[in-house]
UniProtKB/Swiss-Prot annotation:
Belongs to the HisA/HisF family. SUPFAM superfamilies: Ribulose-phoshate binding barrel. Keywords: Amino-acid biosynthesis, Cytoplasm, Histidine biosynthesis, Isomerase. The active site is at D10 (proton acceptor), D132 (proton donor). NCBIfam families: 1-(5-phosphoribosyl)-5-[(5-phosphoribosylamino)methylideneamino]imidazole-4-carboxamide isomerase. This is 1-(5-phosphoribosyl)-5-[(5-phosphoribosylamino)methylideneamino] imidazole-4-carboxamide isomerase. Its EC number is 5.3.1.16. The keyword Calcium does not apply. Pathway: Amino-acid biosynthesis; L-histidine biosynthesis; L-histidine from 5-phospho-alpha-D-ribose 1-diphosphate: step 4/9. It catalyses: 1-(5-phospho-beta-D-ribosyl)-5-[(5-phospho-beta-D-ribosylamino)methylideneamino]imidazole-4-carboxamide = 5-[(5-phospho-1-deoxy-D-ribulos-1-ylimino)methylamino]-1-(5-phospho-beta-D-ribosyl)imidazole-4-carboxamide. PANTHER family: 1-(5-PHOSPHORIBOSYL)-5-[(5-PHOSPHORIBOSYLAMINO)METHYLIDENEAMINO] IMIDAZOLE-4-CARBOXAMIDE ISOMERASE (PTHR43090:SF2).
C-alpha cells in the first residue's frame, strides 16, 4: 500500500483558517491566498491535497466549486474535498467541479444506507468517509454528531465495520481531542482501526506536529496522513514529509 501525504486547507469566508477541536469560535486566520498555497503544495511534490469547506460543513451547500476547479486546473493536484455534502447531487456536482474524491462526514453517520448506495454508484475510489471520534470513559470510540454536541447510536467500530463490509476503501478518522492541538496523532486509535478493518485504507487526521508523526503513521500501516496546522505554522516542512 502506498502512503499519501495530504497537505490540507480549511476554507471559511474565502480565507484559510484552522479551528481548534472543530470549534468555530476558536478560529485562526492564515490569509486568503488559497490558490498560491495549493500551488506551493504541488511545487513541493505533493500529488494530493485535502480541501475543506467549513462554511458548507456548518450550513450545507458546497461553496468551493470554483476554487476547486481552479486548483485542479492550475496545479494538477488530485483534490480530496468535502464539507456540507447532503445529497447524491452534491457528490456528483463536486466530482464534476474537479474533485478526485469527495469526503462525506456527518451524513455518513446519520444515513449509512444512503452513503453505501453512493459507494456503489460512484465507486470506492471516488469517496472518502470521514469519521470524527471521541473516546468515552469506558474506552469506547463514540461518534459525536450535530457539532459534536450529541452522540450517534452507532460506535466508530460498528460503522467502520459496516462500511468496510459494503466495499468502502478510504476512511479518514479524526480523534477530536487531538484536532488542531499539535499533540501528536492517537497511535492507539489507528492501530485499533487497522486491526479491526485491515481492508480499509485509513487516513490519519488530527494532531500531527512533526516528521516523527508522519513516519509513525506510515509505519503503522496507515494509507496516508492529513497535515494542516503543522504546515501552516511551520512546524513541519512539506518537502520532508513527502520524502518520509
Amino acid at each position: 500500500m502506498s502512503f499519501t501525504v495530504y497537505p490540507a486547507l480549511d476554507i471559511r469566508n474565502g480565507r484559510v483558517v484552522r479551528l481548534l477541536q472543530g470549534d468555530y469560535a476558536r478560529e485562526t486566520h492564515y490569509g486568503n491566498d488559497v490558490l498560491p498555497r495549493a500551488q506551493a503544495f504541488a511545487d513541493a511534490g505533493a500529488q494530493w491535497m485535502h480541501l475543506v469547506d467549513l462554511d458548507a460543513a456548518k450550513a450545507g451547500g458546497y461553496t468551493l466549486a470554483t476554487t476547486l476547479g481552479e486548483i485542479a486546473r492550475a496545479t494538477g493536484l488530485q483534490v480530496q474535498t468535502g464539507g456540507g455534502v447532503r445529497s447524491r447531487d452534491d457528490v456528483a456536482s463536486i466530482l464534476d467541479a474537479g474533485a478526485a474524491r469527495v469526503v462525506i462526514g456527518s451524513l455518513a453517520v446519520r444515513d449509512s444506507e444512503m452513503v453505501i448506495a453512493w459507494l456503489q454508484e460512484f465507486g470506492a475510489d471516488r469517496l472518502t468517509i470521514a469519521l470524527d471520534t471521541r473516546q468515552d470513559t469506558d474506552g469506547i470510540w463514540q461518534l459525536p454528531v450535530h457539532g459534536w454536541t450529541e452522540t450517534a447510536d452507532a460506535t466508530l467500530d460498528q460503522l467502520a465495520v459496516r462500511y468496510a463490509q459494503a466495499g468502502l476503501k478510504h476512511l479518514l478518522c479524526t480523534d477530536i481531542a487531538r484536532d488542531g492541538m499539535l499533540s501528536g496523532p492517537n497511535a492507539a486509535l489507528y492501530a485499533h482501526l487497522r486491526s479491526l478493518t485491515p481492508q480499509l485504507q485509513v487516513q490519519v487526521s488530527g494532531g500531527a506536529r512533526n516528521l516523527a508523526d508522519v513516519a509513525a503513521a506510515k509505519a503503522a500501516g496507515c494509507a496516508g496522513i492529513v497535515l494542516g496546522k503543522a504546515l501552516l505554522e511551520g512546524h513541519l516542512d512539506l518537502d520532508e514529509a513527502l520524502a518520509c
